[in-house]
């Protein structure tokens, strides 16, 4: 019998409570870090230190959540084992095949929603907000160290702090805000694909044409071809040298003719 199998239902409950308190502690630590990051009075050094601590705290929270789920499972197993020993049939409903199927389906959906929630948190990170800020046409200068969320996004997020806030309404605003960004990106994508693609193709053809013309002019002027101006000038210089050579070897008269002796 292993240590987990030998635990009583009471001991399992104690383990579960301890894991729950540990998860709560990690969660409160993360909330403290997020409060510091959201405080505009926080200094740059404090913000940098808080950002460095955040990944480790998040990892500890994930690990404690895993342990908490495992302890819940062990507690349930200990409860069923104790009920079996005492002769109670409180698990009769669980042993119903239909109930087991519903339980499995519910657990599967819960696990899928959890993964989707974690993925959503990653997608709604600072990188996405930076992309939103960059997409604003009124922003001409973008500084990484002085980045702040857009005013519209900041206004929506601040509504979460109000005590009488309708969370679903704020969630709908964020969803609508992100949908508008997606629609704008889709619009620009369609314009780039259909409206600007033909223009770009035409400009590319013209550019290639003039590039070829420029290369031909360069070859005509400075190329090594026999008909290039460079070769023609070299031939002219060579002919001049050949013409001037006899005048240096033989005497000439006043009119420039060679004097024959």
Swiss-Prot record:
It is found in: Nucleus. GO terms for cellular component: nucleoplasmic THO complex; THO complex; THO complex part of transcription export complex; transcription export complex. Disulfide bonds: none annotated. Pfam families: THP2. GO terms for biological process: cellular response to azide; DNA recombination; mRNA export from nucleus; stress granule assembly; transcription elongation by RNA polymerase II. GO terms for molecular function: nucleic acid binding. Transmembrane segments: none annotated. InterPro entries: THO_cplx_su_Thp2. The keyword RNA-binding does not apply. It comes from the Eukaryota. Keywords: Nucleus, Transcription, Transcription regulation. Component the THO subcomplex of the TREX complex, which operates in coupling transcription elongation to mRNA export. The THO complex is recruited to transcribed genes and moves along the gene with the elongating polymerase during transcription. THO is important for stabilizing nascent RNA in the RNA polymerase II elongation complex by preventing formation of DNA:RNA hybrids behind the elongating polymerase. Present with 2840 molecules/cell in log phase SD medium. Component of the THO complex, which is composed of HPR1, MFT1, THO2 and THP2. Together with SUB2, TEX1 and YRA1, THO forms the transcription/export (TREX) complex. THO associates with DNA and RNA in vitro. This is THO complex subunit THP2.
């Amino acid at each position: 019998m292993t240590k987990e199998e030998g635990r009583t239902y009471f001991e399992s409950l104690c383990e579960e409570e301890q894991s729950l308190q540990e998860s709560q502690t990690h969660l409160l630590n993360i909330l403290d870090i997020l409060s510091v990051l959201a405080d505009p009075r926080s200094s740059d050094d404090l913000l940098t230190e808080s950002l460095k601590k955040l990944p480790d705290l998040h990892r500890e929270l994930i690990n404690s959540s895993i342990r908490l789920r495992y302890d819940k499972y062990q507690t349930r197993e200990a409860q069923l084992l104790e009920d079996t020993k005492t002769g109670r049939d409180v698990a009769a409903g669980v042993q119903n095949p239909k109930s087991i199927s519903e339980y499995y389906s519910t657990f599967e959906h819960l696990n899928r929603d959890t993964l989707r929630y974690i993925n959503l948190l990653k997608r709604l990170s600072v990188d996405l907000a930076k992309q939103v800020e960059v997409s604003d046409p009124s922003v001409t200068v973008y500084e990484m160290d002085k980045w702040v969320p857009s005013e519209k996004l900041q206004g929506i997020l601040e509504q979460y702090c109000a005590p009488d806030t309708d969370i679903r309404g704020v969630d709908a605003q964020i969803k609508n805000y992100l949908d508008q960004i997606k629609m704008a990106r889709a619009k620009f994508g369609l314009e780039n694909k259909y409206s600007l693609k033909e223009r770009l193709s035409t400009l590319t053809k013209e550019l290639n044409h003039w590039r070829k013309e420029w290369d031909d002019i360069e070859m005509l002027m400075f190329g090594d071809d026999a008909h290039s101006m460079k070769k023609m000038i070299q031939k002219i210089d060579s002919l001049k040298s050949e013409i001037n050579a006899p005048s240096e070897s033989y005497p000439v008269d006043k009119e420039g003719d060679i004097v024959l002796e």
